[in-house]
């Protein structure tokens, strides 16, 4: 929904290649509101031979969804944190993407991103991962939306990441995982247990051994989680 220059798509493709997957079977869809960044994303993907669909123009995904009738198996996003002035379009109050959850605050787009992403997921097995500022976890103005997300069993995991993960800011952020199907069963060669009614919480803020290097979750640390 806010693909920027397409860096996430490039890295996702590299991940698929590294794990023996078929990148030709992957269709990439994205949208970007800034014209210069939109053009850069198209160039970035084209020179790497990645098949992409970024809509017909650079425009906000809230006011003009370029993939309006599509649902997706997987969604990744790193939306602008605490975006203001995103709700300046005529149908904001009655936007069908908010149905069943309530209208998100017009002064902060955090929960508008969440509800938009949830709306775009395949209803049977869609999974999303996206980053938000930590303040989204306890924002009093969005309490009812969070309550309904939990009641509808849409949240798979909340992972608070270490500080200094970004070059532009030293704040800690949260990785949200949404899942439309937390039931157990076979999945890409693995057998998943039933996680219905469960939410995994992980706080990684103490993993801060070197504040001068950008962080990667090391194998020993993933073993601690497992």
Task: Give the role of each language-model region.
Residues 20-24:
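Conserved SF1/SF2 helicase motif Ia
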Residues 27-32:
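Conserved SAM-binding motif I beta-strand of class I
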């Amino acid at each position: 929904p806010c693909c920027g220059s397409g860096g996430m798509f490039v890295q996702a493709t590299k991940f698929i290649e590294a794990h023996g997957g078929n990148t030709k079977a992957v269709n990439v869809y994205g949208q970007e509101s800034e014209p210069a960044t939109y053009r850069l994303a198209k160039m970035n993907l084209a020179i790497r031979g990645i098949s992409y669909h970024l809509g017909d123009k650079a425009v906000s995904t809230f006011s003009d969804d370029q993939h309006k009738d599509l649902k997706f198996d997987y969604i990744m996003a790193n939306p602008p944190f605490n975006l203001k002035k995103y709700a300046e379009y005529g149908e904001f109050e009655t936007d069908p993407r908010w149905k069943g959850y309530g209208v998100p605050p017009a002064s902060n787009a955090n929960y508008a991103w969440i509800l938009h992403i949830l709306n775009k997921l395949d209803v049977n097995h869609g999974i999303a991962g996206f980053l938000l500022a930590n303040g989204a976890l306890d924002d009093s103005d969005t309490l009812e939306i969070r309550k309904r997300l939990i009641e509808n069993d849409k949240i798979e995991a909340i992972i608070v990441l270490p500080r200094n993960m970004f070059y532009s800011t030293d704040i800690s952020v949260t990785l949200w995982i949404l899942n439309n199907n937390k039931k157990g069963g076979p999945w890409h060669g693995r057998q998943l247990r039933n996680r219905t009614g469960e939410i995994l919480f992980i706080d990684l803020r103490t993993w801060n051994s070197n504040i001068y290097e950008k962080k990667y979750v090391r194998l020993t640390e993933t073993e601690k989680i497992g």
